[in-house]
């Protein structure tokens, strides 16, 4: 998650520190967390340069895991979204699932409906689906930044599709052909009776990252992303006059 935020301003992640606080020491859980952090650092091509582990039974229930990422960018190449203009194209990169957002709502639904984490959704258990690691987009975005005039990058995390508005409040982002959400999102909507508008402003709904580029560089951008990413790459919309975000298929508008 941290490295994905870092690349959204055009910065290359270079280092990471982690912090793990536990109610009681559990070597097995700590080992699994360490493996995950190591794998994530490898995928992002960064070093874990430090961290802290604490046992705090008076303050923590379960555990608290946090981290911080440091990145580098030349000042003249920082991506702020101020170059976004009418006619630009929005390209989506597929997510791997929930991406660490909306879990409070998911746990509430599972508890109220009596679902166990072993409950099958398709060929996978809910537990395995919820533990699917967040997709890391560092490699493909750094390659894209070298070759295309990227106007904006949005990490679709908490806040969902509304995160596009953080890039530029003077235009309207139109999602005309959204990515297909994974089955877990349909499950959440059905079992929790959650409206589409709430779903799209809480979850990534299948799109983990949005890239905004000039229309005349769209084909090059898609080609570079497809060659360097494991994620599905798709043109999902465009930038228009107005303000906010439209998701046309679901007749949604956010301001």
Q: What residues fall within each predicted segment?
A:
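Active-site cofactor/substrate anionic-group-binding motifs, chiefly glycine-
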Residues: 1-8
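Short connector loops/turns at beta-strand edges and beta->alpha or beta->beta junctions
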Residues: 9-13, 111, 115, 159
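Short loop/turn motifs at secondary-structure junctions
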Residues: 10-12, 105, 149, 232
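Glycine-rich anion-binding loops of enzyme active sites
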Residues: 12-104, 238, 248-250
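Glycine-/charge-enriched secondary-structure boundary and capping motifs
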Residues: 29-47, 58-63, 122-131, 135-255
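Acidic, glycine-rich loop-and-beta core segments that form the ion-binding/anion-interacting portion
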Residues: 86-124, 128
């Amino acid at each position: 998650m941290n490295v994905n935020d870092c690349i959204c301003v055009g910065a290359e992640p270079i280092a990471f520190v982690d912090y793990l606080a536990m109610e009681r020491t559990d070597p097995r859980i700590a080992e699994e967390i360490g493996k995950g952090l190591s794998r994530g650092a490898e995928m992002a091509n960064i070093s874990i340069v430090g961290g802290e582990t604490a046992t705090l039974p008076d303050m923590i229930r379960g555990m608290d895991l946090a981290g911080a990422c440091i990145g580098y960018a030349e000042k003249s190449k920082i991506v702020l979204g101020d170059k976004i203009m009418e006619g630009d194209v929005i390209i989506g990169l597929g997510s791997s699932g929930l991406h660490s957002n909306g879990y409070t709502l998911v746990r509430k639904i599972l508890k109220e409906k009596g679902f166990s984490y072993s409950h099958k959704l398709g060929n996978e258990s809910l537990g395995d689906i919820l533990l699917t690691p967040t997709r890391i987009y560092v490699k493909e975005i750094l390659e894209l930044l070298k070759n295309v005039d990227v106007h904006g990058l949005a990490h679709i995390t908490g806040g969902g599709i509304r995160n596009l508005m953080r890039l530029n409040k003077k235009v309207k982002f139109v999602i005309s052909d959204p990515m297909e959400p994974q089955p877990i999102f349909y499950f959440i909507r059905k079992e929790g009776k959650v409206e589409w508008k709430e779903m799209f402003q809480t979850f990534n709904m299948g799109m983990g990252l949005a890239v905004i580029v000039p229309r005349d560089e769209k084909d090059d951008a898609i080609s570079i992303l497809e060659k360097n990413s494991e994620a599905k790459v798709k043109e999902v919309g465009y930038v228009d006059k107005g303000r906010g975000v439209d998701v046309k298929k679901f007749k949604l508008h956010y301001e």
